[in-house]
Curated annotation (Swiss-Prot):
Descriptive protein name: Transcription factor IIIA
Domain of life: Eukaryota
Cross-referenced SMART domains: ZnF_C2H2
Function: Interacts with the internal control region (ICR) of approximately 50 bases within the 5S RNA genes, is required for correct transcription of these genes by RNA polymerase III. Also binds the transcribed 5S RNA's.
Organism listed in the record: Saccharomyces cerevisiae (strain ATCC 204508 / S288c) (Baker's yeast)
Gene Ontology MF: a single term: RNA binding
Length: 429
């Protein structure tokens, strides 16, 4: 089939909207009767006043209405403007009605629930929802509905059987659902965008959920021989194995106590400090944001690394001031887990693992730092990545300065002892 949807009788489904379905309304309640008083009385006067603008065949019963039409429609004149917004209106009554939208005043209240609305039309539409005034006209069916579309859908699906799929006899309650069903499952012109990526499997599917059901039932997950993590397909397993290859991972997070220990993630370094060393050994730049440390140094005159005693005091000051803004290390673990879950979802969606691994299409921004081959599609993400490198360099610089200051302090402690010893030797002579 093409794009046109037919019912069981061969009639285009789009024409169902044009069909006239006999509808009977229940007798109005007192509230609905009151609505009739809000309707403007219709005039029986003939429309003898015609608009003389080219291409306009409008006619009106009064000259004042004709003048109003010409000023508003053809001349664009709207004399009544709202002082709270930029809207303007032809009639003063329209402006007064609009002003209710800027206030809490609701002049029309529902007699059933007391809800307030701003116009009579809104009150009419609201009060009708309290009564099932639309009655099914079929014999033996006394169902009532609040709204006309509900009644129409009931008649089409239950009594006329015009919302049944001609291919699989599946019934639907709404015409658009039948159209979507036929388009997804029975239209030969619609391609199958979801393909199975398992080796030797060439099956294609129209919807993503069908592909997921196929993978779950027909292709078991492959487990990693190192960590036993289940992976989707051979591509997913190959991509996962990269994290176990140390030669492909850049390790920029180094322990300042253990010279041979370096890690690829900050979280792993913090875990190392927690398991091997004490919390006091963790550098400040790992526990807090480097920007917060710089701000405290600038605002409060904290000096880092002048002496061992002052260094401990200043670090304690910084720790106390930053404790409330401290980033818990667990956040890094949560972020990593979210990335793992996102990666697994993308693999399960049928994306090729090689494309995920070498996704360089349209990535024109390449990181210029050594041992970093990251590429980006947008300048914003590229600059954000470069900022991370700069922050890391600043952290390394702070560590280096602390080590140099510590060396100078140790030398200053030794020099007085050497001078005193030389003086004593000279006195003995």
């Amino acid at each position: 089939m093409g794009g046109e949807v037919l019912n069981n009788e061969g009639m285009p489904l789009a024409e169902l909207k044009q069909e006239t379905i006999p509808i009977s309304r229940s007798e109005s309640s007192e509230s609905l009767n009151s609505l009739t008083s809000t309707r403007s009385s219709s005039s029986n006067r003939p429309k003898t006043y015609f608009c003389d603008y080219d291409g306009c065949d409008k006619a009106f019963t009064r000259p004042s209405i004709l003048t109003e039409h010409q000023l508003s429609v053809h001349q664009g004149l709207r004399a009544f403007q709202c002082d709270k917004c930029a809207k303007s209106f032809v009639k003063k009554s329209h402006l007064e009605r609009h002003l209710y939208t800027h206030s809490d005043t609701k002049p029309f209240q529902c007699s059933y629930c007391g809800k307030g609305v701003t116009t009579r039309q809104q009150l009419k539409r609201h009060e009708v929802t309290h009564t099932k005034s639309f009655i099914c006209p079929e014999e033996g069916c006394n169902l009532r509905f609040y709204k006309h579309p509900q009644l129409r859908a009931h008649i089409l699906s239950v009594h006329l059987h015009k919302l049944t799929c001609p291919h699989c006899n599946k019934s639907f309650q709404r015409p658009y659902r039948l159209r979507n069903h036929i388009s997804k499952h029975h239209d030969p012109e619609v391609e199958n965008p979801y393909q199975c990526t398992f080796a030797g499997c060439c099956k294609e599917f129209r919807i993503w959920s069908q592909l997921q059901s196929h993978i779950k039932n027909d292709h078991p997950k492959l487990k990693c021989p190192i960590c036993s993590k289940p992976c989707v397909g051979e591509n997913g397993l190959q991509m996962h194995m990269i994290i176990h290859d140390d030669s492909l991972v850049t390790k920029n997070w180094k322990c300042h106590i253990c010279p041979d220990m370096s890690f690829s993630r900050k979280h792993d370094l913090l875990t190392h400090y927690g398991s091997i060393h004490t919390e006091e050994d963790i550098p400040l730049e790992l526990k807090y944001k480097i920007s917060d440390i710089q701000q405290l140094v600038q605002d409060h005159g904290v000096q880092l690394g002048n002496s061992k005693h002052s260094n401990e005091q200043d670090e304690e000051k910084i720790s106390n001031r930053l404790r409330k803004r401290r980033k818990l290390t667990e956040n890094n673990n949560v972020e990593f887990l979210q990335n793992e879950v996102d990666l697994e979802k993308r693999l399960e969606s049928g994306e090729n693992g090689l494309n995920l691994l070498l996704n360089t299409v349209g990535r024109k921004y390449r990181c210029f730092y050594n041992n970093c081959s990251r590429t980006f599609k947008t300048k914003e993400k590229y600059e954000k990545h470069i900022d991370k490198h700069k922050v890391h360099e600043l952290k390394l610089k702070i560590l280096q300065e602390k080590e140099e200051n510590k060396t100078l302090v140790d030398q200053n402690h030794k020099e007085p002892f050497i001078i005193q010893k030389e003086t004593q030797s000279a006195g003995d002579k």
